[in-house]
Amino acid sequence: GSEKEADMGPLVTRAHRDRIAGLIDSGEAAGAKVVIDGRTVEARGAADGFWLGPTLFDNVTPDMEIYTEEIFGPVLSVVRVSSYAEGVELINANAYGNGTAVFTNDGGAARRFEKDVQVGMIGVNVPVPVPVAYYSFGGWKRSLFGDTHAHGTEGVHFFTRGKVVTTRWIDPANRPTDGLQLGFPRNV
């Protein structure tokens, strides 16, 4: 956190940190390869913070808890598949639909991936597909909390109360002589 070169701060609560650390333990126990282990990170001068460094798993399988649970922490899992179709099927079969990423040099394959997967955020050659704030942030399926996304036009609409004002101003020089007219304007 507080250092200029830091990319990430502490987690919000001890319970959340402990939950994520438990999921990392679970992934390791289930046989996933821990490539980078964030459980050993310490913050100088902030030992009481809820720190957990980035963790990268390889060889994750769909039956592992680190795949079936939505972690919401600094953990990435590499799940290997043997074909494009198998990868899309794996993504679409997941109960969550927050985000996914593909790495490719083939623009056509990237466009096909964008259309084929059922998730709310897609990264192409980007590991964590979190858009800037004026775009929608949020997933599909069980990854969506409530009925709107946090940012973008849906977020603006959620935090804004719309108002419609309908007015009609009559030119005093053209005021009707037969009384007040409350109906729709007519072209005469």
Predicted regions and their residues:
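Short beta-strand to alpha-helix junction loop
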Residues: 10-21
